[in-house]
């Protein structure tokens, strides 16, 4: 191999299973940078699709958890079984988003922010991507809540207590979500998006498909069962609760939950994770640029980085 063209040498084990920490950060920046090059309609379509996937799996999770909320069954297994089943079903949404390359706002708070900090996207591009992804996620999640969950009658309220367990499960979840104080909701949202952003980072780090699925599944399961607050999931759940006339109000939904959840999710991705990662690995990305060039814009799963060590002549 000619001088200056040798491959970047890493641990043989990591070649088979995972990237190094430096490579993971580089892939994260490149992934975030790539989003800035999509036209508005493409970004919106990808964001709507992600919102629909969250709605699909939140619907399934609510039905599955609601079946264990049947009043007689609840006396024997308790409400913890409903939470377990709900949390176990919901991570499928994130696997669908990864497989289709859809665009989720909460993951962008990490990836696109690292690209902004590395000056690979402008502030205007950053705001464009973040606002379109949030709006598209909202549109997809709320549309699914109305056209499928509400119009199908799956969460319809019944006067007969033996048939009302699905509605009651949704109602109790919604009431709990709007009962938090503003600060409590922000804190719960921070905890949530740490797990979600780590799930994105696992996809960028782990090369083995089964290992990636396993890691993402349990990262998302952890936040779902812990009762953390996720802005897109809450858009679906709380707007559906409004549609089926649960014990919630518009002002409580949007100002007591969705607003602080949005703030907390952003803090987690942009400040808790993106800023420290940038500080630790910013020079690794600069070294990568000097040896490789400007890189390429690829999808989350297909992004491939081949570092060259031309500076030391090895």
From Swiss-Prot:
GO terms for cellular component: plasma membrane; vacuolar membrane. It comes from the Eukaryota. It holds the Pfam family Form_Nir_trans. Residues 69-78, 150-185, 233-257 are extracellular. The keyword rRNA-binding does not apply. GO terms for molecular function: high-affinity secondary active nitrite transmembrane transporter activity. GO terms for biological process: nitrite transport. Residues 1-47, 100-128, 207-211, 279-314 are cytoplasmic. Signal peptide: none annotated. It catalyses: (S)-lactate(in) + H(+)(in) = (S)-lactate(out) + H(+)(out); formate(in) + H(+)(in) = formate(out) + H(+)(out); pyruvate(out) + H(+)(out) = pyruvate(in) + H(+)(in); acetate(out) + H(+)(out) = acetate(in) + H(+)(in). The keyword Transmembrane applies. The chain crosses the membrane at residues 48-68, 79-99, 129-149, 186-206, 212-232, 258-278. Keywords: Cell membrane, Membrane, Transmembrane, Transmembrane helix, Transport, Vacuole. Inhibited by the Malaria Box compound MMV007839 and its derivatives BH296 and BH267.meta. It is a multi-pass membrane protein. It is found in: Cell membrane; Vacuole membrane. Belongs to the FNT transporter (TC 1.A.16) family. Homopentamer. Monocarboxylate-proton symporter that mediates the efflux of the waste product lactate in the intraerythrocytic parasites; active in acidic-to-neutral pH range. Transports L-lactate. This is Formate-nitrite transporter. The lineage of its organism: Eukaryota, Sar, Alveolata, Apicomplexa, Aconoidasida.
